[in-house]
């Protein structure tokens, strides 16, 4: 796959709509040409302990952050006519659909690909198919795991190798 947008969300709690950060990496002709990162005020607006332990974000980080529709207005032109790619598509696509629903936005039915599924086919011998493991197999060192932009960049790297 030569043209796509890798996407990753982090959530504040167990609600898929509670996206608190997003990372996007734009790939054209097999090269990373742009990226985008934003904190987002989650909906519902509370953090649970476990999610904060994973990504390190808390209420204070997103108190002054924009709400999702304002962030998506910046993302939409970047990803126009591009398929989306995520590592564990059900999670990220689920987040996107849930937050669109919460804000009563029309979901454009994005074409979505999954590097997790692809890695299970391409690298059957791996002990696991977690993002950092698959990224390393593809020659990418993921240093800031669970930062949405770092995870989107790792996903883009994987997608360029196996999709």
Each language-model region and where it sits:
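Short, glycine/acidic-enriched loop or turn micro-motifs at the edges of active sites
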Residues: 11-13, 117, 154
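Conserved beta-strand -> loop -> alpha-helix junction used to position metal-binding or nucleic-acid-contacting
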Residues: 106-119
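Acidic, divalent-metal-coordinating active-site segment for phosphoryl/phosphodiester hydrolysis
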Residues: 147-160
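Generic alpha-helical structural context detector
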Residues: 117-120, 136, 157-160
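Conserved non-catalytic scaffold segment of RNase H-like nuclease domains
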Residues: 1-109, 124-146
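Catalytic-loop motifs flanking and including active-site residues across diverse enzymes
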Residues: 92, 111, 151-154
